[in-house]
UniProtKB/Swiss-Prot annotation:
GO CC list: endoplasmic reticulum membrane; ERMES complex
Keyword Glycoprotein appears in the UniProt entry: no
Subcellular localization: Mitochondrion outer membrane; Endoplasmic reticulum membrane
Organism of provenance: Candida glabrata (strain ATCC 2001 / BCRC 20586 / JCM 3761 / NBRC 0622 / NRRL Y-65 / CBS 138) (Yeast)
Protein name: Mitochondrial distribution and morphology protein 12
Family per record: Belongs to the MDM12 family.
Protein topology in the membrane: Peripheral membrane protein
Note on domains (UniProt): The SMP-LTD domain is a barrel-like domain that can bind various types of glycerophospholipids in its interior and mediate their transfer between two adjacent bilayers.
Encoding gene per record: MDM12
């Protein structure tokens, strides 16, 4: 069963796009950068106008991992506060009882197939460091544009305790996005990577373009460094999404007051 989402409303949410920029910039600031680059910064992010295709594959009860995560959060809040109220109104802080989220009939989990080949875009700036003829001989400002992003994955979306949990499970075979680094599972549509830890890329394809001054467009050494920088950014973006979204990690949206 397929359904639509209000992509326009999502793309116009300035708080969400700001949080994405802040999250990625915090990640880039923590990276150990190679000697030929410094100061990578995401300066613009846009969801675009093309919405993803979403197909519902299964409806079930949420995984126990999500209940455990909510309970752990309650426990941490209880440790930092002398008074805490559970969802049923009991004073957990004073009684000393452990906060437990009870399973309810309204708790739901969706297994969905998420396919995106849209016009989402990212713009980054960076400084390319030329270390010849001497170290840090020159720095060149670069503008890096990323577009044509392709994703096709199975995803869990769980709702419980007024919270939504989102986690990517694995890539799905796709005639447009498949490449030589993946093999098809003969028993189903799921992609199996050649290495176990690479069961999911999340980002399967993207277009990356770098603007550099005319003076250096024909300089072989500079162009090689630009190519290395592009590969570095692509890999780190994939690593970031794996770390934040790929199971056993997830994104948690809390709708409690």
């Amino acid at each position: 069963m397929s359904f639509e989402i209000n992509w326009e409303k999502l793309s116009s949410d300035s708080d969400l796009t700001s949080n994405i920029r802040e999250g990625l910039n915090g990640y880039f600031q923590e990276l150990e950068l190679p000697s030929y680059v410094r100061a990578i910064e995401l300066v613009d992010f846009g969801f675009g106008k093309i919405a993803p295709n979403i197909t519902l594959r299964e409806i079930s009860s949420p995984l126990q991992d999500f209940y455990d995560a909510v309970n752990e959060e309650y426990e941490e809040d209880n440790e930092t506060s002398s008074e805490m109220h559970g969802r049923d109104g009991q004073n957990v802080g004073e009684s000393g009882e452990e906060a437990v989220v009870e399973k309810k009939e309204t708790d739901t989990q969706f297994l969905i197939e998420f396919e995106y080949k849209g016009d989402m875009s990212l713009t980054l700036t960076a400084e390319l460091v030329l270390n010849y003829p001497v170290e840090r001989f020159m720095t060149l400002p670069l503008k890096i544009s990323i577009s044509n992003i392709g994703l096709h994955s199975l995803c869990l979306v769980s709702y419980l305790a007024k919270q939504v949990f989102i986690s990517m499970l694995c890539d799905v075979s796709d005639p447009v996005l498949d490449d030589v680094d993946c093999v098809l599972d003969p028993n189903g549509p799921v992609l199996l990577a050649n290495k176990p830890l690479e069961r999911i890329s999340i980002i399967r394809s993207m277009k990356i373009e770098t603007e550099i001054g005319d003076r250096f467009k024909d300089d072989g050494s500079t162009l090689r460094s630009v190519g290395q920088l592009e590969e570095f950014i692509v890999q780190k973006l994939k690593d970031f999404l794996r770390k934040e979204l790929a199971w056993p990690s997830w994104v948690n949206l809390d709708f409690n007051d």
